[in-house]
A protein has these predicted regions:
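Active-site helical microenvironments for divalent-metal-assisted chemistry
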Residues: 1-5, 9-196
Length: 196
């Protein structure tokens, strides 16, 4: 069984790498690095094979000529449903992020996801995007950071994914309040030196 899962994951990686082969991220790095990093986050969380495969394939339907039927035929209905769910969540657009809008978005995410693993893949996707946020324009960085703080971190908290929640909040705070972030980082470093 383990051998079969490794084979499926390898096929998912090869398929995604081929589909994204000519694409680059805004940072200039090869696009395939993003789904691989998302898959690594989920593998580290001990998520199942279907989730890791969906992470590898999560942008193929949205950003390449791949159809959901292609994903289903090659990797099964469960993986295809996860990919479809992540794609639908990704396509929810908001123009502003006030508290009411954030609450509505969190509720919409939960209502749209028949399988909670869709949200888990989306959280890992957002986490990697936050780790690489510097490549975006400042206005987009600030919007993504606010959206992450108000929508994604509370979702991670609600799902009991505290390590993801903390990192999402930390990365958001870095962009939203850079002076306060640096001040706190200095205090933590000084405190660490005193303890050592």
């Amino acid at each position: 069984r383990r051998q079969r899962q490794m084979c499926i994951r390898d096929r998912a990686y090869c398929f995604a790498a081929e589909k994204h082969c000519n694409q680059k991220r805004r940072s200039g790095e090869m696009y395939i690095n993003h789904p691989v990093e998302v898959a690594i986050i989920l593998a580290d969380l001990k998520m199942d094979c279907d989730v890791v495969c969906a992470a590898l394939l999560h942008d193929t339907v949205e950003d390449t000529e791949t159809s959901l039927a292609d994903v289903s035929g090659l990797f099964g209905d469960t993986v295809a449903e996860l990919v479809d769910g992540v794609t639908k969540l990704t396509n929810i657009e908001v123009d502003s992020m006030d508290e009411k809008q954030a609450l509505t978005l969190r509720k919409m995410f939960l209502a749209m996801s028949k399988d909670i693993r869709v949200i888990i893949v989306k959280l890992a996707d957002r986490l990697h995007n936050m780790r690489t946020l510097a490549a975006l324009r400042e206005d987009r960085r600030l919007f993504k950071a606010r959206e992450t703080m108000d929508v994604y971190a509370p979702l991670a908290d609600r799902l009991g994914m505290s390590s993801i929640k903390w990192e999402l909040e930390d990365l958001s705070f870095f962009y939203l309040e850079p002076d306060a972030y640096q001040r706190i980082a200095r205090m933590v470093a000084e405190s660490r030196e005193v303890r050592e």
